[in-house]
């Protein structure tokens, strides 16, 4: 089985700021991390590989050349190789254009199962995974928080919605999107890091390699654009009380009722 995990390099949201004049994210000097939902997807793929050693795991991303470092992290964790889509033509792609490029790359690389994170923390659209499945014309299951069973023919997963859990069995090939809460990603392994130093395991593809019409990707191929980005202003307000235990309990209960957190 061949599993391709889609990843995105995103700015660390704990240190992100916004240019108030342009409304754009300030990325200069901000540490880049692997999107958390995507890391969970990689861990899920590696757990399948742990049980079925013949499984091949490939990490794939579209981005700037520096995104290769993220792919190397994935290989160091246990993936077999990384694939980087990088080209100026691809710059400025929205989710629609991104899915076109990723679908073309997936067709070129080959796959049985595609795992993507539910959404990226720098956009929160949750669109790329489903759109890529649509481009490929294959089934998709989103919001997966557990892989129950997988074989050469199908995969069975559990997905959690607001008030219900669903068990879904779907034929391969397919796309699933994963939640960061589903597992704890493993650390990079020393042996894998040494192997990376000996052998280049990152393949780079340009738009020419993909054979995609340049007018369908990048700014030209993007029907949507971000008008503005902003961060919510948070103000801290602290009040100090010196009360007895009973008075404290009464005050907490009153406050919770006022905020309609409790009703009785």
Give each language-model segment a name.
Residues 1-264:
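N-terminal glycine-rich FAD/FM-binding segment characteristic of electron-transfer flavoproteins
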